[in-house]
Curated annotation (Swiss-Prot):
Catalytic activity: 2 (2R)-3-phosphoglycerate + 2 H(+) = D-ribulose 1,5-bisphosphate + CO2 + H2O; D-ribulose 1,5-bisphosphate + O2 = 2-phosphoglycolate + (2R)-3-phosphoglycerate + 2 H(+)
Species of provenance: Oltmannsiellopsis viridis (Marine flagellate)
Gene: rbcL
Protein name: Ribulose bisphosphate carboxylase large chain
Function as written in the Swiss-Prot or TrEMBL entry: RuBisCO catalyzes two reactions: the carboxylation of D-ribulose 1,5-bisphosphate, the primary event in carbon dioxide fixation, as well as the oxidative fragmentation of the pentose substrate in the photorespiration process. Both reactions occur simultaneously and in competition at the same active site.
Keyword field: Acetylation, Calvin cycle, Carbon dioxide fixation, Chloroplast, Disulfide bond, Lyase, Magnesium, Metal-binding, Methylation, Monooxygenase, Oxidoreductase, Photorespiration, Photosynthesis, Plastid
SUPFAM superfamilies noted in UniProt: RuBisCo, C-terminal domain, RuBisCO, large subunit, small (N-terminal) domain
Amino acid sequence: MPTTETKTGAGFKAGVKDYRLTYYTPDYQVKETDILAAFRMTPQPGVPPEECGAAVAAESSTGTWTTVWTDGLTSLDRYKGRCYDLEPVPGEENQYIAYIAYPIDLFEEGSVTNLFTSIVGNVFGFKALRALRLEDLRIPPAYVKTFQGPPHGIQAERDRLNKYGRGLLGCTIKPKLGLSAKNYGRAVYECLRGGLDFTKDDENVNSQPFMRWRDRFLFVSEAIYKAQAETGEIKGHYLNATAPDCEEMYKRAECAKDFGVPIIMHDYLTGGFTANTSLATYCRDNGLLLHIHRAMHAVIDRQRNHGIHFRVLAKALRLSGGDHLHSGTVVGKLEGEREVTLGFVDLMRDDYIEKDRSRGIYFTQDWCSLPGTMPVASGGIHVWHMPALVEIFGDDACLQFGGGTLGHPWGNAPGAAANRVALEACTQARNEGRDLAREGGDVIRQACQWSPELAAACEVWKEIKFEFETIDTL
């Protein structure tokens, strides 16, 4: 057989790359179609930030650790990611924000899975980096338009429910695990007849031995119809369709559709973006609203220096599809700094959001009329929090009181009634021009005169506070 002679130096030179030579381009002019990322980097001691930024750009696009001869078979200049800016993080030693631009052609259209696999799939284990956090993404209009987004959106949900001019009220049924399907349905009925708009499966309620999913769907549907008949209002329950596989997930969604309920639920991080996008498509085609729980998010977003900020996860969900998304409360038991939370709440609801670093928004985002996702505030909230919640979130939010409903001393229905009275009192006071930040306590106390249920709730929870310093601040 003939032998092939390889001439070194003919066209390419083998060896380990200095990423800065190719992927650090401070003179680059960002294109309107580029996907932009802001990474918080903590380099290892002695590693220049330019090298780290270039390495992140390389590994999340066309690069590898060494020169390869196949580089000459394509246009690296067209397809490579570029670290185009670096800035030190104020008040932090050896931390930098690296801005990276990715050509749109690197990503499959309409695929959050591919977007995340490329940008965060492999770079977080780099030895040159002590820590890395994706703070924000700019999704360009050209890429946004390849997604269908939420199945219906905020306005379509209000039209379907015939509920306007106030926030929506929800409640997670407790105990989250251990109830039989029939007792679970009883709890749902009591909450809905008392005045709530929704009740909810907890994120880990799927199909366990004590309560199989079909039994739960049946008893909950019966509770919904009974409460609707008594109150004259449209009611719903977030039936969790999260399942071991997509075929089973579709089966549960179809059962909910057959029962005629308005909304189902999915755990989008544990279930995965591919499954979530598929379920959103099913809901859009079959007239179901889709509530999204963010179970597992804190594993990814809690640490200030490493992981992915929740604003990125929220943007990804809006692309993938969800009509509701848990967003934190600012005032309850779960993590959430006010300005940062308001920043990603706007990214979920609004169509055009300007860059505002004071709220953690690194890039201007244009959603091109993609439907909005309604934020869900839940976690350790009760009637005394209502003025702050109405003032912070406004009307286009779902306020979810689990223990704050079921913990009422008189039972579920009085607990629901207390929350409904508090919400309507605060909404009316705001509409009359009162300052809920200063007068909220007075508004609640005045409403207690007309609602013994609210008065009892106020007495029970008057001393309850969750006073811990937030970890994730600007």
